[in-house]
From Swiss-Prot:
Keywords, comma-separated and alphabetical: Chloroplast, mRNA processing, Plastid, RNA-binding, tRNA processing
One of the protein's GO biological processes: RNA splicing
Record lineage: Eukaryota, Viridiplantae, Streptophyta, Embryophyta, Tracheophyta
GO cellular component: chloroplast
The keyword Translocase is annotated on this UniProt entry: no
Coiled coil: none
Protein name, per record: Maturase K
Similarity comment text for this entry: Belongs to the intron maturase 2 family. MatK subfamily.
Function summary: Usually encoded in the trnK tRNA gene intron. Probably assists in splicing its own and other chloroplast group II introns.
PANTHER family reported for this sequence: MATURASE K (PTHR34811:SF1)
Subcellular location as annotated: Plastid, Chloroplast
GO MF entry, a single one: RNA binding
Amino acid sequence: MEGVQRYFKLDRSRQDDFLYPLIFQEYIYALSYDHGLNRSILLENVGYDNKSSLLIVKRLITRMYQQNHLIFSDSNQNPFFGHNKNFYSQMISEGFGVIVEIPFSLRLVSSLEGKEIAKSHNLRSIHSIFPFLEDKFPHLKYVSDILIPHPIHLEILVQALRYWVKDASSLHLLRFFLHEYHNWNSMITPKKSISIFSKRNQRFFLFLYNFHVCEYDSIFIFIRNQSYHLRSTSYGALLGRIFFYGKIEHFVEVFANDFQTILWLFKNPFMHYVRYQGKSILASKGAPLLMNKWKYYLVNFWQCHFYVWSQPVRIHINQLSKHSLDFLGYLSSVRLNPSVVRSQMLENAFIIDNAIKKFDTIVPIIPIIGSLAKARFCNALGHPISKPSWADSSDYDIIDRFVRICRNISHYHSGSSKKKNLYRIKYILRLSCARTLARKHKSTVRAFLKRLGSEFLEEFLTEEEQALSLILPRVSSTSRSLYRGRFWYFDIICINDLANHE
């Protein structure tokens, strides 16, 4: 980032950020390579078999501007990239992904200069959302699960990106690169992009999708804050946008009504909005009529401002007491916790039934078992099986791989209210590890576990379980309540791969 900042300091007199020359800088591809190595994923870090060559990049860009090579074909041997299609597309997308993120990173750094945001790094954690849900949702009544629609055409994203990247050459290169692919909708949808691109080749396309969602957030939350009696303060650190207020005025003209009149229809101090990736949650304490107003408002908002089509019937309004939210790898719900209180006054006794609303989070065991079965750790019924592809590794590497996967899952799902499902996942991974080692040594699982003893089981304990076992005895009621309790961590910045089953 220091090298990038020096590049932009060379020409402070010009206000435009020219990104195109950075494509020919080899350290850009080194940055994308380092980012891939440092990325925290569930399984192994995918190695990088080929080296980025500046000559290859220049030759590829030259071919992109030759019209006779822009021939669309349904065959796997694309005339644009030839036999090295995967390598070229991976290199350009990774490098371009780093480049287009530069203006956003620099503006973010400059916007935070001179501002003190207490513990802002903690707000990056995914788990920071759940304490907010625990605090607010027990007091709310209705909730809507909303899937943010993706753009019908990627040219919409290119046009929106012009407000940030004002370099015409970079935008032209972006168009060339996007037009090479046929199935545009599969690129912009994160889950489908994984099946088309490798795990190291999706950074740029996820950036485009996140940029689209952040554009939606920036305008929607601005209007939401205007409609509230109590303004939101958590959105102050986000970046400002060029021509933002001009777009707001255009959006108001679409409705052909006074802006304040529109906002008056939605005034409600108990409306809450949570979003992660392409899924958002809208919850309210008000009547269903207000939720219906917001539903049709969102549909018109998407169609008129982002030119995307969505049907109101796909946005469902449910009661929180009767509905579970499938969000961020957890099944969350608000349940009633009944309690009976006996009150004695002189000679009269009263029995009072009291029900307390509690926010409950559990691990969805069936989807996670499906993910484990897809990764060949168990069968479809959840019975552990060996991992033959790992049998050639050393015993230490095999155990280390299984332990890291188990601890990552336990760390991410530490906020579960019920630990039974989490213990079942640990059991599957532990026995799968034992079967893999027994397969390698041509032995039985029983004999192998007998030889290793309890040390093998202790490897799968998480750090917090090991710490609790040292601090408190397991027989005490306090220790049992801590083991059953929920833990939210502030160091989780991406959803676990096995939890991302949507």
